[in-house]
């Protein structure tokens, strides 16, 4: 069957060459004249052109037909791309098929869906072609034996039919060539986002990315051909002219971010959000795919026509290596050379792309669903929900009831073991868990900026854990410890907790610094305390001010006495102690918050001086610092007794510059609901710097605070149940070095009525004797106790 319109090419072809390179009504090839005569060689369906008569001259480019009176079929099912060597499978043109209709039956019978050439599968028996019985412009030709092709040579022709199939790009579904970016130009390399996502091909027009078109080609039918055949996430089809490459975007009225002809990340990704990454900056953009230099750019159509070159624009040249293509610097090839060499050149083709430098947009486009998030904490006056949280914290009542949570490990992708170990202990603390669960979780739309990043992060952390029902104890014998298996939840990475170190510019985030679990615990508790103080200030009248205490800091005896002698102390009163001895007690301004109600206690430091009244200072604490350096200290009780022992201060002088002897004694004035004991294993020595004390310190599961440790004024007020504690978490330090090591945590699980050992994302059940048993490699560092009367 003849083609719809007659086209002519020049030169003699063999049967196989004619079949392979016969050009359909989509395009024609002009070869040098053969003996200066024109010979029609296309199949004729009419007698419009006679033998030897000149046919209309049609210029043919590598990828396009430059003809204002184009004869291309107005069909959007085909696309043309560069084909320097049609015999090589890697140069097969991109094309897709569509269901047939009555208007396209003629085309479907005569044209193959790949490269739009005649193929054996597309020509029915008895149909006329250039080598059959039908007449052609060059006369009757003798049939020749068909050349043998290697196995699988025509495999790329399989699957072409009515059902849309996966589109081939240069003979392959993988568009690796688009990701092969030359880094010869460092400026370009910085501005080009490189996607590592594996591309997917798709023939559905709904998945294509449409670009604004400002300068379309003169040939409208070319746009119809090129519009629907691009791979999803692939740049526009490119037309190469004079060793330069220009891209023709699809003509669609919808706006979308710019796609340059140099490189384009593929649309198919494994993440839930599309992120445009440029120059190291990541922008969350659910609806916008790409951002350039932090702003969304609108497309500029790139053209290498003479009119576009005449415009006053700044251009940037980019080099793209196209594997499997001929080198751009190679000498020009004649059309006849196509028949002599079917092997692709090993030298990659270098295509130069000219792009316009679009002026930067001053404002970033933000969708309706997106809300601008300010970096870092803001003042409480700018926080839209700060007053709500303040009112909630003012009315909150601490809940000490144990809660059974499904354990979850924490993924450690860095040196975060000291953080993970501390977080697991805090999650196992019932009043801490209930406090954070009482604060609602706000969305970004409800809370676009925050004055409480630490509170927000720990509210989010506690909501990562779900309740697990407490197992019945009916079958449990008295005194028997039942250990059951447990199925932990999926581990997760609390990256929002790690970021707090940089938000508050903590010294723990400094490189090369030893991470310390006790120091991190103080960082967390002090940070939460300060944020709650700032919220509490919102509820007070404007003339009332709160002095924000940065948390309990250690006070040395000499500094303390000097402060006591200064006039205008914060607060002081005179007390009459035993034997009618009076003492002056001073206390710094201290405002309670829910954090201090859980972890906060008070110590009384009394200074004794000859011929002077006793002076006492109350100072708060979150953790009790226990010195274990002495050889006499083998248990926690020994360390507590050493804490309250009287010590002498040498070298103290009065205002008269007379050296006097003074003594100091520390006692416990107020015991917190949650008592954290810090075993000070890291000490500084004059010869060896910081060293770790590797010694076993025995600690009981049930700890009783002796009355001798209490201040004289509270001994009779605190009952035994209020000074008895039970262990619920232990943080261990692994290793013998003070400048390295690892941290793990054992926590008591009320649902199991037993203990769990958590090492980052590993969770396993252990027995109680394994908790109190220490080894040389693993030593207890932080002990978490709860008051028995609150259990």
From Swiss-Prot:
Superkingdom of origin organism: Eukaryota
InterPro entries (alphabetical): Papain-like_cys_pep_sf, Peptidase_C19, Peptidase_C19_UCH, USP_CS, USP_dom
GO CC term, one of those recorded: nucleus
Regions of compositional bias (Polar residues) in chain numbering: 118-139, 270-284
Reaction catalyzed: Thiol-dependent hydrolysis of ester, thioester, amide, peptide and isopeptide bonds formed by the C-terminal Gly of ubiquitin (a 76-residue protein attached to proteins as an intracellular targeting signal)
Ranges where the USP domain occurs: 408-788
UniProt keyword annotation of Hydrolase present: yes
Active site: 417, 742
SUPFAM superfamilies (UniProt xref): Cysteine proteinases
Assigned keywords, A-Z: Autophagy, Cytoplasm, DNA damage, DNA repair, Hydrolase, Nucleus, Protease, Thiol protease, Ubl conjugation pathway
Subcellular location: Cytoplasm; Nucleus
Enzyme Commission no: 3.4.19.12
Gene Ontology terms: biological process: autophagy; cellular response to interleukin-1; DNA damage response; DNA damage response, signal transduction by p53 class mediator; DNA repair; negative regulation of canonical NF-kappaB signal transduction; negative regulation of stress granule assembly; protein deubiquitination
Chain spans, region Disordered: 118-156, 270-291, 560-580
Gene Ontology MF annotations: cysteine-type deubiquitinase activity; cysteine-type endopeptidase activity; p53 binding; transmembrane transporter binding
Function (record text): Hydrolase that can remove conjugated ubiquitin from target proteins such as p53/tp53, rps2/us5, rps3/us3, rps10/eS10, becn1, snx3 and cftr. Acts as an essential regulator of p53/tp53 stability: in unstressed cells, specifically deubiquitinates p53/tp53 in the cytoplasm, leading to counteracts MDM2 action and stabilize p53/tp53. Following DNA damage, translocates to the nucleus and deubiquitinates p53/tp53, leading to regulate the p53/TP53-dependent DNA damage response. Component of a regulatory loop that controls autophagy and p53/tp53 levels.
Family assignment from sequence similarity: Belongs to the peptidase C19 family. USP10 subfamily.
Xref: PANTHER family: UBIQUITIN CARBOXYL-TERMINAL HYDROLASE, UBIQUITIN CARBOXYL-TERMINAL HYDROLASE 10
Protein name, as recorded: Ubiquitin carboxyl-terminal hydrolase 10-A
Gene that this polypeptide is encoded by: usp10-a
């Amino acid at each position: 069957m003849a083609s719809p319109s007659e086209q002519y090419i020049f030169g003699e072809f063999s049967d196989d060459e004619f079949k392979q390179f016969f050009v359909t009504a989509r395009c024609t090839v002009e070869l040098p004249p053969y003996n200066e005569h024109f010979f029609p060689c296309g199949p004729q369906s009419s007698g419009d052109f006679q033998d030897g008569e000149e046919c209309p001259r049609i210029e043919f480019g590598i990828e396009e037909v430059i003809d204002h009176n184009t004869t291309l079929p107005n069909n959007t099912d085909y696309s043309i791309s560069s084909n320097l060597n049609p015999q090589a499978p890697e140069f097969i043109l991109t094309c897709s098929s569509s269901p047939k209709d009555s208007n396209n039956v003629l085309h479907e019978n005569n044209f193959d869906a790949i490269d739009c050439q005649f193929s054996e599968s597309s020509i029915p028996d008895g149909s006329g072609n250039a080598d059959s019985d039908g007449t052609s412009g060059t006369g009757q030709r003798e049939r020749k034996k068909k050349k043998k092709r290697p196995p699988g040579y025509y495999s790329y022709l399989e699957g072409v039919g009515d059902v849309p199939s996966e589109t081939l790009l240069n003979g392959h579904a993988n568009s690796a060539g688009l990701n092969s970016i030359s880094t010869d130009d460092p400026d370009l390399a910085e501005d080009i986002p490189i996607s590592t996502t594996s591309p997917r091909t798709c023939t559905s027009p709904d998945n294509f990315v449409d670009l604004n078109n400002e300068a379309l080609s003169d040939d409208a039918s070319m746009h119809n051909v090129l519009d629907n055949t691009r791979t999803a996430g692939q740049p526009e089809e490119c037309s190469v002219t004079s060793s330069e490459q220009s891209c023709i975007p699809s003509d669609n009225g919808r706006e979308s971010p710019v796609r340059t002809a140099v490189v384009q990340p593929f649309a198919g990704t494994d993440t839930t959000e599309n992120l445009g990454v440029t120059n190291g900056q990541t922008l969350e953009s659910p609806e916008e795919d790409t951002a350039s230099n932090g702003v969304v750019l609108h497309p500029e159509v790139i053209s290498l026509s003479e009119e576009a070159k005449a415009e006053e624009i700044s251009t940037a040249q980019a080099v793209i290596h196209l594997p499997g293509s001929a080198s751009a610097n190679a000498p020009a090839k004649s059309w006849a050379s196509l028949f002599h060499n079917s092997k692709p050149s090993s030298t990659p083709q270098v295509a130069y792309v000219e792009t316009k430098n679009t002026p930067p947009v001053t404002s970033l486009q933000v969708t309706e669903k997106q809300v601008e998030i300010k970096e870092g904490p803001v003042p409480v006056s700018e926080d839209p929900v700060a007053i709500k949280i303040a009112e909630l914290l003012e009315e909150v009542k601490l809940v000490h009831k144990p809660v059974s949570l499904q354990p979850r490990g924490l993924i450690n992708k860095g040196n975060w073991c000291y953080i993970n170990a501390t977080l697991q202990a805090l999650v196992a603390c019932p009043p801490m868990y209930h406090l954070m669960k009482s604060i609602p979780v706000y969305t970004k739309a409800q809370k676009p900026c925050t004055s409480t990043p630490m509170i927000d992060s720990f509210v989010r952390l506690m909501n990562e854990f779900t309740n697990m029902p407490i197992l019945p104890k009916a079958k449990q014998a008295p005194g028997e410890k039942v250990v059951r298996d447990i199925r932990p939840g999926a581990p997760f990475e609390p990256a929002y907790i790690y970021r707090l170190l940089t938000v508050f510019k903590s010294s723990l985030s400094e490189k090369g610094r030893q991470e310390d679990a006790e120091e991190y615990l103080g960082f967390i508790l002090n940070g939460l305390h300060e944020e709650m103080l700032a919220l509490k200030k919102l509820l007070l009248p404007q003339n009332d001010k709160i002095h924000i205490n940065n948390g309990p800091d250690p006070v040395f005896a000499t500094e303390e006495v000097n402060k006591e002698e200064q006039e205008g102390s914060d607060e002081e009163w005179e007390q009459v102690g035993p034997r009618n001895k009076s003492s002056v007690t001073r206390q710094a301004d201290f405002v309670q918050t829910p954090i201090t109600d859980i972890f906060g206690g008070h110590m009384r430091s009394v200074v004794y001086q000859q011929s002077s009244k006793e002076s006492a200072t109350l100072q708060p604490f979150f953790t009790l610092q226990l010195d274990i350096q002495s050889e006499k200290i083998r248990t926690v009780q020994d360390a507590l007794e050493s804490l309250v022992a009287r010590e002498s201060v040498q070298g103290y002088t009065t205002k008269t510059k007379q050296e006097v002897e003074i003594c100091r004694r520390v006692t416990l004035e107020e015991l917190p609901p949650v008592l954290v004991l810090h075993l000070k294993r890291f000490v500084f020595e004059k010869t060896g710097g910081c060293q770790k004390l590797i010694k076993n310190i025995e600690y009981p599961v049930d700890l009783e605070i002796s009355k001798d440790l209490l201040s004289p004024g509270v001994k009779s007020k605190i009952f035994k149940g209020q000074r008895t504690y039970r262990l619920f978490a232990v943080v261990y330090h692994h290793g013998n070095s003070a400048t390295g090591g690892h941290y793990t945590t054992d926590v008591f699980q009320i649902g199991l009525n037993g203990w769990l050992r958590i090492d980052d994302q590993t969770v396993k059940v252990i027995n109680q004797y394994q908790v109190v048993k220490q080894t040389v490699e693993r030593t207890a560092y932080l002990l978490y106790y709860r008051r028995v009367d609150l259990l």
